[in-house]
Amino acid sequence: MIPELNYLKETGFLDVQAIYTAPGLHQVPEELEIQLQKQLEIAKKSAKKIIVVFGGKYCYINMRDSYRTIDTVIEEMREDGYYIARTEVENCLDMLATVDERKTLAEGQKVWFCTPGWLKYRDMVFKGWDKANANENFPQYTGGGIMLDTIGFFDDYAMEHIEEILDFSDWASIPLESRTVGLERLKDVLISAMAEEDRL
């Protein structure tokens, strides 16, 4: 969500200090936990109210302890005097479009959805993947790939990096296109995570 959150800061919707974990850590939950704890400690030095912009169900899966969730990690970081909340979504896709909205965009096809960050940071998101991993995962999406684009990222990125988009499509063996979705959903998700007295 780095491109989207930076855009909301640049356009004045967010007046926050944004601190990020590295992209793609849903594949490495131990590292995600370490980075999240570190970033929350940094955030607590400059803010009393903190929102963790992260999905719940699919973004942190601890194979060693299935009862340990992202919310468990966040709960352990709570202390008196701080408001810490997580965005109430299952994954990053839910921040940009609901399940029903994605079904509409898919038009009855089996589609792989992504956000701009998945393309921009693909080397980190798909770290350790080779063509065999891609062949195991992507061809099932017979409807191709759709990027949920809230900020015009895809067209701008294609102007300078068309080869990277084509390389990704070739590697994944599916075409990748974008669909414009508004920022309203993301704004609503962020507002819902705010302390009640701060909601617009």
Q: Which residue stretches match the model-derived regions?
A:
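Structural alpha-beta junctions
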Residues: T11-Q17, K45-S46, V73-R86, E164-R179
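Gly/Ser/Thr-rich loops at beta-strand to alpha-helix junctions
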Residues: M1-P3, L25-E30, V53-R68, N91-L93, ...
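N-terminal basic/disordered segments at the start of proteins
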Residues: M1-G12
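Long, charge-dense
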Residues: I61-D123
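A conserved mid-domain beta-alpha-beta active-site/ligand-binding segment of alpha/beta enzyme cores
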Residues: R102-L166
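Glycine-rich, highly charged phosphate/nucleotide-binding loops
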Residues: P29-A43
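A short beta-strand-loop structural module common to alpha/beta enzyme folds
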Residues: D15-L32, S178-G182
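C-terminal, charge/polar-rich interaction regions
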Residues: I151-L200
